[in-house]
A protein has these predicted regions:
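Hydrophobic alpha-helical transmembrane segments of multipass integral membrane proteins
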Residues: 41-44, 74-80, 84, 113-121
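Cytoplasmic membrane-interface regions of multi-pass membrane proteins
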Residues: 84-99
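Membrane-associated alpha-helix detector
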Residues: 1-65
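Short alpha-helical packing/oligomerization segments
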Residues: 59-88
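Alpha-helical transmembrane segments and their membrane-interface junctions
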Residues: 43-51, 116-136
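Transmembrane alpha-helical segments of multi-pass membrane proteins
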Residues: 66-74, 100-117
Length: 136
C-alpha cells in the first residue's frame, strides 16, 4: 500500500466512542493541514507570478495575510465538522451508524484542497482577460 493510499484510505475507528473518534480525527489533522497549506502556498505562488506578468495588474502586496489566517482557521473549523458529524451519526443511529470517518476525511480533504486551488484558474483567467483587453 502506498503512502497516498494510507493517507486517503485510513482504517476507520472501530471502537466508536466520542473520545476515540476525536483521537482518530486529531491524528490526521496535521496531514490535512499540510495538504491544504501546501495547496495554499502553491496558489499564492501562482497568483504572485500571474499578477507580475504584463500587462500590469496590482500585485498581491501584504494585504493577503489576513485572508490566509482567516482561511486557515475556517479550514480547521470545517475539519472539526467531520468529527462532529461522525459523532452525531453515532448518537443518532447508535450501532447502525456507518463507519464514515475515512469517507468524510477524503471528501473534506478533496473539497478543501480544491477550494484552496480555486484562485489559480481565476488568476490565469484574469490575466488572459487583461491581455485580451490590452491587445484589443
Amino acid at each position: 500500500m502506498t503512502a497516498l493510499t494510507r493517507i486517503l484510505f485510513p482504517l476507520p475507528d472501530y471502537r466508536r466512542t466520542p473520545w476515540t473518534l476525536l483521537q482518530w480525527w486529531e491524528a490526521r489533522r496535521l496531514t490535512y493541514n499540510l495538504f491544504v497549506g501546501g495547496a495554499g502556498v502553491m496558489s499564492l505562488a501562482v497568483m504572485a507570478l500571474v499578477s507580475s506578468l504584463p500587462p500590469g495588474a496590482p500585485g498581491l502586496g501584504f494585504k493577503w495575510w489576513g485572508g490566509v489566517l482567516i482561511y486557515g482557521v475556517a479550514a480547521n473549523v470545517g475539519y472539526t465538522m467531520g468529527w462532529l458529524t461522525e459523532v452525531g451519526m453515532r448518537v443518532l443511529w447508535e450501532e447502525e451508524a456507518p463507519l464514515a470517518g475515512p469517507a468524510l476525511f477524503r471528501q473534506g480533504l478533496s473539497f478543501a484542497v480544491g477550494l484552496t486551488l480555486l484562485p489559480v484558474p481565476l488568476a490565469i483567467f484574469s490575466w488572459v482577460m487583461r491581455l485580451v483587453t490590452h491587445l484589443f
